[in-house]
């Protein structure tokens, strides 16, 4: 046999090779992505030494041709019956290009102006905008400026934080080839890759980056193709006549031709980009929660305004007075600073995570990560090292591991570029076999025959230092065994032990290689078996264990075989309920009803042999079941599911496309940083949850109190003071972002019924306290005002104090004294309290200054209200009866949900069948 580079091509290739234009060798071939550069340098140095010593170089003697093409989504079969020796005619190319377009993905640009304007859309924003219009109509320019400033602040912060430079689709395009070599009108020509059409015949050879999907049409063809850009897996895949190839794959070894079956958006990569665009649509989970809260508060504002307007109608109040009442209710009815405070809280958390080498690209992902219940993890490069390593070899009696290793390395390629992953693993492992490493350079390679798909082995003929001629082989264990058996009988015990070991390694997911040699004119000797596997990262098992303790279920999604996936899961302590992704029935091909399929995915520990659509589908099914899902990955193949997941996590070494699609990018290797991220996200969630309870209670407090004050007494707090109350409440609690917060040992979610129940009760207690203050302040005995004071000033101080102190109650997991607030939060609240006190003492924005004794009485009364609030909150936090009353527990799955799942699955199958028929 001869090297692929020097061997003749297939008959069809030979017939057109004379027409091949001069081509430059590609500057780069795809290599093992996770290999360390120092190890690669060592291997290159070793290969140079071997080549310089013996003058043997199995680098391709031919010029590496420009990248070729191949395509995806099936076109009519008659379009694919192109003559491989002649190709398409120029006229046919024009017809097909008109029908299918260029081989490129569609550009979908999002307007930055529209994106910015959308930050002014939402229930809370609408109320703020209405308040700004009212303030302008009343010529209240101070309030108008403050409200507009808050609107711009909220929009500006959100826009900057959510804006991501670069397009995910552009990153996906970078994986595609720029040119292709095709047969047109019987000539082999080089064309831009985007001009390839379905039915084109493309040339494939070492180094070719395939720009389309296609099917191999060269008979007796053997290719090894790196599909890591599609599947993320490190091992090259063997391809033969009739096999499918995919866009962005790279030919590692072999020559042949393929017919294009799909181009542009119809390729696997194109469809992956479409999935990313689809997943990018829709509202985030956190946005939905805030909008839901805003809608309810808006309804309450309208109800309060109806009450006020009705009272004003019977009193025949003037329109200006009614509008001022309306402005006051509108300002206090919704938490105008809610978006800014929660965004600041998450931004501070993101800065902390950055110190832990976790870069947050989408702030709302922090909230989603806190509630994640299922972690879907890619295997290669995420749970494993993405590089093959050799395990303990099995040797027959009388053979040393060094002998086996030396023979295997002698039967290894001497390429520097595009070195086979298995050969690289052997050469890297030489450092563990010093005797074999020292002896290797003393042998002279006479002949080298790369992997033969028929004999399933690699063969090298070498000369020992003593001048002895030795034939070395490594390959499929049973084929190597057959080679030896054809030469002479093997002892039964050796034969049985060898086969048993091969079967054991296969069941454990190892890729085993048999090794044998023949000295001179002697007999073949079976030496043993060398198992290899992509090993788990050193910290992955511990990380997975910690994730489980934090309430996460971990599912593995990998492009590897089921056996390999199960062995990896066994080593990591994951479950071994791993299934082939075919059982997901993509494209309507599954037989399971929708509800049964959802149960199947929910209970599985993972899936093997997956493509991007499978990962996307798994995430989608779990989300439809109500789970918050996180997805980790590092390759182009992971981009759609990273974008679809509630929290997409790109691990260290991820491709640009994966980083762009992810919400959080880890710079540290493996998943260990995710533990800190989970804990931090739950701390941040606790801060946000406590602030939202606090802020809703404040809005309800003022709606109830001011609504009754206006309706019953036909009076209200000054509008300027209302604005200051709203500002003070949010300024003081901005420091909640730095508060000392606990983290939950389980995933946390927005328990909205319980949240509203707590907020309503706290708001009512606050309103009662304010009403008592209002109605008793002028009593001759026991009234708050003793000598002199202003009603507006006293009410402003009482409301400010009790509202500001409420955050100390809602922030604690237990009684308010059980957790000490951070100095930032305590300092901010105290500073606002001092300012509010000065407002009252010196009559700023009120009629008159207030006596110091009156101010002290307000402080004492407010402390009493604070204690009552603390008691109510503690009882609600610890009461199971309150939980049941608020219906905060997750509802059990209803039969109607399963019926909908079954119906949708049936409709999908019908739709797919209809598409095939038409």
From Swiss-Prot:
<dbReference type="InterPro" id="IPR006534">
    <property type="entry name" value="P-type_ATPase_IIIA"/>
</dbReference>
<keyword id="KW-1003">Cell membrane</keyword>
<dbReference type="Pfam" id="PF00702">
    <property type="entry name" value="Hydrolase"/>
</dbReference>
<comment type="function">
    <text>The plasma membrane ATPase of plants and fungi is a hydrogen ion pump. The proton gradient it generates drives the active transport of nutrients by H(+)-symport. The resulting external acidification and/or internal alkinization may mediate growth responses.</text>
</comment>
<dbReference type="InterPro" id="IPR018303">
    <property type="entry name" value="ATPase_P-typ_P_site"/>
</dbReference>
<dbReference type="GO" id="GO:0005739">
    <property type="term" value="C:mitochondrion"/>
</dbReference>
<feature type="topological domain" description="Cytoplasmic">
    <location>
        <begin position="1"/>
        <end position="115"/>
    </location>
</feature>
<dbReference type="GO" id="GO:0005524">
    <property type="term" value="F:ATP binding"/>
</dbReference>
<dbReference type="GO" id="GO:0005829">
    <property type="term" value="C:cytosol"/>
</dbReference>
<feature type="modified residue" description="Phosphoserine">
    <location>
        <position position="61"/>
    </location>
</feature>
<feature type="transmembrane region" description="Helical; Name=3">
    <location>
        <begin position="292"/>
        <end position="313"/>
    </location>
</feature>
<dbReference type="GO" id="GO:0008553">
    <property type="term" value="F:P-type proton-exporting transporter activity"/>
</dbReference>
<keyword id="KW-1133">Transmembrane helix</keyword>
<feature type="transmembrane region" description="Helical; Name=2">
    <location>
        <begin position="141"/>
        <end position="160"/>
    </location>
</feature>
<feature type="cross-link" description="Glycyl lysine isopeptide (Lys-Gly) (interchain with G-Cter in ubiquitin)">
    <location>
        <position position="252"/>
    </location>
</feature>
<keyword id="KW-0460">Magnesium</keyword>
<feature type="topological domain" description="Cytoplasmic">
    <location>
        <begin position="161"/>
        <end position="291"/>
    </location>
</feature>
<dbReference type="InterPro" id="IPR023299">
    <property type="entry name" value="ATPase_P-typ_cyto_dom_N"/>
</dbReference>
<keyword id="KW-0472">Membrane</keyword>
<feature type="cross-link" description="Glycyl lysine isopeptide (Lys-Gly) (interchain with G-Cter in ubiquitin)">
    <location>
        <position position="555"/>
    </location>
</feature>
<keyword id="KW-0640">Prion</keyword>
<feature type="topological domain" description="Extracellular">
    <location>
        <begin position="846"/>
        <end position="857"/>
    </location>
</feature>
<dbReference type="InterPro" id="IPR023214">
    <property type="entry name" value="HAD_sf"/>
</dbReference>
<feature type="compositionally biased region" description="Low complexity">
    <location>
        <begin position="1"/>
        <end position="18"/>
    </location>
</feature>
<dbReference type="GO" id="GO:0032126">
    <property type="term" value="C:eisosome"/>
</dbReference>
<dbReference type="InterPro" id="IPR023298">
    <property type="entry name" value="ATPase_P-typ_TM_dom_sf"/>
</dbReference>
<feature type="transmembrane region" description="Helical; Name=5">
    <location>
        <begin position="720"/>
        <end position="738"/>
    </location>
</feature>
<feature type="modified residue" description="Phosphothreonine">
    <location>
        <position position="175"/>
    </location>
</feature>
<keyword id="KW-0832">Ubl conjugation</keyword>
<feature type="topological domain" description="Extracellular">
    <location>
        <begin position="137"/>
        <end position="140"/>
    </location>
</feature>
<keyword id="KW-0547">Nucleotide-binding</keyword>
<feature type="region of interest" description="Disordered">
    <location>
        <begin position="1"/>
        <end position="84"/>
    </location>
</feature>
<feature type="transmembrane region" description="Helical; Name=1">
    <location>
        <begin position="116"/>
        <end position="136"/>
    </location>
</feature>
<feature type="topological domain" description="Cytoplasmic">
    <location>
        <begin position="875"/>
        <end position="918"/>
    </location>
</feature>
<dbReference type="Pfam" id="PF00690">
    <property type="entry name" value="Cation_ATPase_N"/>
</dbReference>
<feature type="topological domain" description="Cytoplasmic">
    <location>
        <begin position="775"/>
        <end position="824"/>
    </location>
</feature>
<keyword id="KW-1278">Translocase</keyword>
<feature type="transmembrane region" description="Helical; Name=7">
    <location>
        <begin position="825"/>
        <end position="845"/>
    </location>
</feature>
<feature type="topological domain" description="Cytoplasmic">
    <location>
        <begin position="348"/>
        <end position="719"/>
    </location>
</feature>
<comment type="subunit">
    <text>Interacts with its cargot receptor EXP1 for its transport within the cell and maturation.</text>
</comment>
<dbReference type="GO" id="GO:0046872">
    <property type="term" value="F:metal ion binding"/>
</dbReference>
<feature type="modified residue" description="Phosphothreonine">
    <location>
        <position position="912"/>
    </location>
</feature>
């Amino acid at each position: 046999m001869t090297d692929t580079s020097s061997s003749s091509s297939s008959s069809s290739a030979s017939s057109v090779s004379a027409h091949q234009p001069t081509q430059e060798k590609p500057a780069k071939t795809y290599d093992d992505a996770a290999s360390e550069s120092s190890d690669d340098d060592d291997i290159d140095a070793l290969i140079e030494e071997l080549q310089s010593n013996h003058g043997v170089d199995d680098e391709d003697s031919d010029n590496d041709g420009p990248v070729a093409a191949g395509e995806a989504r099936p076109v009519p079969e008659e379009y694919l019956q192109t003559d491989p020796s002649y190709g398409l005619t120029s006229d046919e190319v024009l017809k097909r290009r008109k029908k299918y377009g260029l081989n490129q993905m569609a550009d979908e640009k999002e307007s930055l102006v529209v994106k910015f304007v959308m930050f002014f859309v939402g229930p809370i924003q609408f109320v703020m905008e209405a308040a700004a219009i009212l303030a302008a109509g009343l010529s209240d320019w101070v309030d108008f400026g403050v409200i507009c400033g808050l609107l711009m602040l909220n929009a500006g912060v959100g826009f900057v934080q959510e804006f991501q430079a670069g397009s995910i689709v552009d990153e996906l395009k970078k994986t595609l080839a720029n040119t292709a070599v095709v047969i047109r009108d019987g000539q082999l020509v080089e064309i831009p890759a985007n001009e390839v059409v379905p039915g084109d015949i493309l040339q494939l050879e070492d180094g070719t980056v395939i720009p389309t999907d296609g099917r191999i049409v060269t008979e007796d063809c053997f290719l090894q193709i790196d599909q890591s850009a599609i599947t993320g897996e490190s091992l090259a895949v063997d391809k033969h006549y009739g096999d499918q190839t995919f866009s962005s794959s790279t030919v590692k070894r072999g020559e042949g031709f393929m017919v294009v079956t799909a181009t542009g958006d119809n390729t696997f990569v194109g469809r992956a980009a479409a999935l990313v665009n689809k997943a990018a649509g829709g509202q985030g989970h956190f946005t939905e929660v805030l909008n839901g809260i805003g809608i309810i508060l808006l309804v309450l504002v309208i109800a309060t305004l109806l009450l006020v307007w009705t009272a004003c109608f019977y009193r025949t109040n003037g329109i200006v007075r009614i509008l001022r009442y309306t402005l006051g209710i509108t300002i206090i009815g919704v938490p105008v600073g809610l978006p800014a405070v929660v965004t600041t809280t998450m931004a501070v958390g993101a800065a902390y995570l950055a110190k832990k080498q976790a870069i947050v690209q989408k702030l709302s992902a922090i909230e989603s990560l806190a509630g994640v219940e299922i972690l879907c993890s890619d295997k290669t490069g995420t749970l494993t090292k993405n590089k093959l390593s050799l395990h303990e070899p099995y040797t027959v009696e009388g053979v040393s591991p060094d002998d086996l290793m030396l023979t295997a390395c002698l039967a290894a390629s001497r390429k520097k570029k595009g070195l086979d992953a298995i050969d690289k693993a052997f050469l890297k492992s030489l450092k563990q076999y010093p005797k074999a490493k020292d002896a290797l350079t003393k042998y002279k390679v006479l002949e080298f025959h790369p992997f033969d798909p028929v004999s399933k082995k690699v063969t090298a003929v070498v000369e020992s230092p003593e001048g002895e001629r030795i034939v070395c082989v490594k390959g499929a264990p049973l084929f190597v065994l057959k080679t030896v058996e054809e030469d002479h009988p093997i002892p039964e015990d050796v034969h049985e032990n060898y086969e048993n070991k091969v079967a054991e390694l296969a069941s454990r997911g190892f890729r085993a290689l048999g090794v044998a040699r023949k000295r001179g004119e002697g007999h073949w000797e079976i030496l043993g078996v060398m198992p290899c596997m992509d090993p788990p990262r050193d910290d992955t098992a511990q990380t997975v264990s910690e994730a489980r303790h934090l309430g996460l279920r971990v599912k593995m999604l990998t492009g590897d075989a089921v056996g390999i996936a199960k062995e990896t899961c066994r080593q990591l302590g994951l479950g071994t309920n791993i299934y082939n992704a075919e059982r997901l029935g993509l494209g309507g091909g599954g037989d399971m009803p929708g509800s049964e399929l959802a149960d199947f995915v929910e209970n599985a520990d993972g899936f093997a042999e997956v493509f991007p659509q499978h990962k996307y589908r798994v995430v989608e099914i779990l989300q439809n079941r109500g789970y918050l899902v996180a997805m980790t990955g590092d390759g182009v193949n992971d981009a759609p599911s990273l974008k679809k997941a509630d929290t997409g996590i790109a691990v260290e070494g991820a491709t640009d496309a994966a980083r762009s699609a992810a919400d959080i990018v880890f710079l540290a290797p493996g998943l260990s940083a995710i533990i800190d991220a989970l804990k931090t996200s739950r701390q941040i969630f606790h801060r946000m949850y406590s602030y939202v309870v606090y802020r809703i209670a404040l809005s309800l407090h003022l709606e109830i109190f001011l609504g009754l004050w206006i309706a019953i007494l036909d009076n209200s707090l000054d509008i300027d003071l209302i604005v200051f109350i709203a500002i003070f409440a949010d300024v003081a609690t901005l420091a909640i972002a730095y508060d000392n917060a606990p983290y939950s040992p389980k995933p946390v979610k927005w328990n909205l019924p319980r949240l509203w129940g707590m907020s309503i009760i706290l708001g009512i207690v606050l309103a009662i306290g304010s009403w008592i203050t209002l109605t008793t302040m002028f009593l001759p005995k026991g009234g708050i005002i003793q000598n002199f004071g202003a009603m507006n000033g006293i009410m402003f101080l009482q409301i400010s104090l009790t509202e500001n102190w409420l955050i100390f109650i809602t922030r604690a997991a237990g009684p308010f004294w059980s957790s000490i607030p951070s100095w930032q939060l305590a300092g901010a609240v105290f500073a606002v309290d001092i300012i509010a006190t000065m407002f009252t003492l010196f009559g700023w924005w009120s009629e008159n200054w207030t006596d110091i004794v009156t101010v002290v009485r307000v402080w004492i009364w407010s402390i009493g209200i604070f204690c009552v609030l603390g008691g109510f909150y503690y009882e609600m936090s610890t009461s199971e009866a309150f939980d049941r009353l608020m219906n905060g527990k997750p509802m059990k799955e209803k039969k109607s949900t399963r019926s909908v799942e079954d119906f949708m699955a049936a409709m999908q199958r019908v739709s797919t069948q209809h598409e095939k028929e038409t």
